[in-house]
Amino acid sequence: MQIFVKTLTGKTITLEVEPSDTIENVKAKIQDKEGIPPDQQRLIFAGKQLEDGRTLSDYNIQKESTLHLVLRLRGGMQIFVKTLTGKTITLEVEPSDTIENVKAKIQDKEGIPPDQQRLIFAGKQLEDGRTLSDYNIQKESTLHLVLRLRGGMQIFVKTLTGKTITLEVEPSDTIENVKAKIQDKEGIPPDQQRLIFAGKQLEDGRTLSDYNIQKESTLHLVLRLRGGMQIFVKTLTGKTITLEVEPSDTIENVKAKIQDKEGIPPDQQRLIFAGKQLEDGRTLSDYNIQKESTLHLVLRLRGGY
């Protein structure tokens, strides 16, 4: 059968092949036609880098399929992968390698199946289809390898419309990862998602285990209104603080924002609006607090009542 190989210069090469040809054979044919040594060739099909030992039929490459040929930079670069046991593995990679390729290299060295590997860089879990250069991973960068527990666990996410979404997660998944999974399923951008568990809004950088979220726990998904609103908080010293909030923010969330701005621990804050002391578990909309409302902040004396 015939297949096509497209180079980065836009040139298309036609090859005569068999479904049982290995990728290695195909690279040899490209060398015959174009003079490019196989060790400088990387072949991509359907977004995947093809491995030398596999056959065309393994990748479901059929007649008149088009492969993409990327030239491997001589020498590539080294990166390090640190495991939880403290062992450091050195890998030879290219900036254009996908995370999937990196996991395959780790499997070659360490025997760990890719589906049990989670790679972390700069606090972010790396996605299989992305490349090292997408994440700005450069020579001698260190990735962290976390083993994925077989099977993980299921959690539920309930929306305000009453719909319940089931997600496959790991205890070590970050809230950011969970929001990405919700985006995959429901198409809701992470920056419009707020996740609540046990009355608390969950922070992107924390993990499910940080919040003691276990299998079959239910999270609540609240959509963040674009833009939110501003409110003011006036202290006894007369100072006024401006906060960006959502009507669905809890009083607890507001106290956390005040702590971020002013350094006052939430347990020392009492918030008053319309003569009422506000309770942690309630939301701003529960108290009809609207944009540009002013709350009063009274400090709770330590040990007081």
UniProtKB/Swiss-Prot annotation:
The record marks 54, 72 as: Interacts with activating enzyme. PANTHER family: UBIQUITIN. The record marks 68 as: Essential for function. GO terms for molecular function: protein tag activity; ubiquitin protein ligase binding. The lineage of its organism: Eukaryota, Metazoa, Chordata, Craniata, Vertebrata. GO terms for cellular component: cytoplasm; mitochondrial outer membrane; mitochondrion; neuron projection; neuronal cell body; nucleus. The keyword Membrane applies. Residues 1-76, 77-152, 153-228, 229-304 form the Ubiquitin-like domain. Interacts with SKP1-KMD2A and SKP1-KMD2B complexes. There is a cross-link at residues 48, 82, 87, 103, 105, 124, 139 (Glycyl lysine isopeptide (Lys-Gly) (interchain with G-Cter in ubiquitin)). The gene is Ubb. Ubiquitin is encoded by 4 different genes. Uba52 and Rps27a genes code for a single copy of ubiquitin fused to the ribosomal proteins eL40 and eS31, respectively. UBB and UBC genes code for a polyubiquitin precursor with exact head to tail repeats, the number of repeats differ between species and strains. For the sake of clarity sequence features are annotated only for the first chain, and are not repeated for each of the following chains. The modification ADP-ribosylglycine is found at residue 76. InterPro entries: Ubiquitin-like_dom, Ubiquitin-like_domsf, Ubiquitin_CS, Ubiquitin_dom, Ubiquitin_ubiquitin-like. This is Polyubiquitin-B. Keywords: ADP-ribosylation, Cytoplasm, Isopeptide bond, Membrane, Mitochondrion, Mitochondrion outer membrane, Nucleus, Phosphoprotein, Repeat, Ubl conjugation. There is a cross-link at residue 76 (Glycyl lysine isopeptide (Gly-Lys) (interchain with K-? in acceptor proteins)).
